[in-house]
Amino acid sequence: MKPWITVGEALSPDGTRLELVEHDGEYIIRADDLPLMSTRMHFSEVELARLVCNKLRSGAKVMIGGLGLGYTLRSALDLLPKDGTAVQVELVPEVIEWNKGPLAPFAGNPLDDKRSELVQGDVAKAIRGARDVYDSIMLDVDNGPSPLVSERNAWLYTDHGLQAIRGALKNGGRVAIWSADDEPRFMSRMKRNGFRAEKHLIQAHKGKGGIRHVIFTGRKT
């Protein structure tokens, strides 16, 4: 059996150890030895964009928080008008380099698309600095509302974080939040912070059973 090969390593600002590993053509990003995402199972990352980018207007501007393996950015670009903009925010520089290097072909080189605008930084800061800017915001940060790998990401899923997301969206704008597991109280939290919220159970691997993830969507009311 072929071993997993470490292709790249990085430390996030809070000290979380990230690894890009490869085995027989499959790539996985791990956080402190726990798998976060895989090139083999990425359907939920694609759906994260499809759920809130399917009816975008000319000139639309969207934000993706968390680059991952690039699949959400690719899915958003596939739905974005020719004159639209997709702002991709990623905190860890090495993750960006991996997506420009060995990971690039898997999602069809989305960072090379002229509609992509790459921001290396904290998505929470990017959200707080925006007001009535985005038609859609997609967040694939950590494991979602819970359980968190890094506590620095908790703010995004609090009342204050959701209020900031709402403020960054245009009227009628939509947010999609990826979650590894269900969080029973999160729907009510979204609703009390001004969203018409829904929950979607999504297969990790299209057309197959097994692992399911949750995507919370909300429209700004």
Model regions: which residues?
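Glycine-centered, phosphate/nucleic-acid-interacting loop/turn motifs that mediate DNA/RNA or nucleotide
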Residues: 173
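Conserved SAM-binding loop and adjacent beta-strand
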Residues: 35-48
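Conserved beta strand-loop-helix elements of the APE1-like EEP
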Residues: 217-221
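The AdoMet/dcAdoMet-binding core of the Class I SAM-like
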Residues: 46-169, 177-180, 187, 193, ...
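Short, basic/glycine-rich phosphate-binding loops at helix/coil junctions
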Residues: 25-31, 140-145
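N-terminal auxiliary segments of SAM/dcSAM-dependent transferases
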Residues: 1-30
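Surface loops and adjacent helix of pleckstrin homology
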Residues: 32, 41, 100-101
